[in-house]
Amino acid sequence: MSAWLLVDAGNTRIKWALVDSAADGWLAEGAALHADAADLAAQWGTAFGAAPPLRVLAANVAGTAVRTRLEQMLAAVAPGAAVEWFASSAQRAGLVNGYRNPAQLGCDRFAAAIGARALAPGRAVVVANCGTATTIDAIDAAGRFVGGMILPGLGLMASSLARNTAQLPQIQPGALLPSPFADNTDDAILAGCLSAQAGAIERAFARHGAVECILSGGAAPYIAPMLAQAPLLAGALRHVDNIVMKGLHAIVRAEGDPC
């Protein structure tokens, strides 16, 4: 077994998984908010035991300060590990990057697209990663990243309309959806924001002629019930946790361990 540490440093949380380069499952996983990033060292120490990984593949969209902090923690808990900071390129793990400037594509979007391709090989797919921002990207059946769209995430969209954070509408995953014509302001904000998110995903799915829609991200459990009502997506919707991490793992699986 060759263990790798995968790290996904997003805008809100840092997620990680310890994986075997030759296996599908994860050996361990965890996460921490940026404010609690110091907890990662303890999580990693527990997961690694006496055998820290020799290789790390990390995607970071949270800036250079977060990268520096992660490098310091990795040096302490996995000294000598070879660390690759994942960046978008013209092609990787069987996915061709169709961006006009491939290096300009966010590494999280490229990783998510690689993950979607690995989960739905040979199929036209749309992957929606619903976090601080919602990204909706298209991959064709031949394995080419076609492009995509970026819009404010569900929370950001709602907070821009609410008067203050204490008045943000609250919803539990799987709860009843608000009426599309709400009779109170909180539900009206929520209905509008959910409709905007779901509508953008449905439109992308239709325009791409996709046969599968992969939904991921922290807001996915809130958006999924509305998408489940869309006849266009019947039988095509799949909720997948940690799609960026799935993409990083797909890279490790595809490329194996370096000699």
Language-model segments: which ranges?
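Adenine-nucleotide phosphate-binding core of ATP-dependent small-molecule kinases
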Residues: 30, 177-213, 237
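Glycine-rich phosphate-binding loops at beta-strand->alpha-helix junctions
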Residues: 13, 59-66, 191, 210-227
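Gly/Thr-rich phosphate-binding beta-strand-loop-beta motif of the actin/hexokinase/Hsp70
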Residues: 1-26, 116, 120-145, 161, ...
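N-terminal glycine/serine-rich phosphate-binding loop of ATP-dependent small-molecule kinases
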Residues: 1-92
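Glycine-rich phosphate-binding/hydrolytic loop that grips phosphoryl groups
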Residues: 236-259
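Short hydrophobic/aromatic-enriched beta-strand-loop microsegments
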Residues: 78-85, 145-151, 232-243
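Active-site neighborhood for divalent-cation/phosphate handling
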Residues: 82-127, 133-134
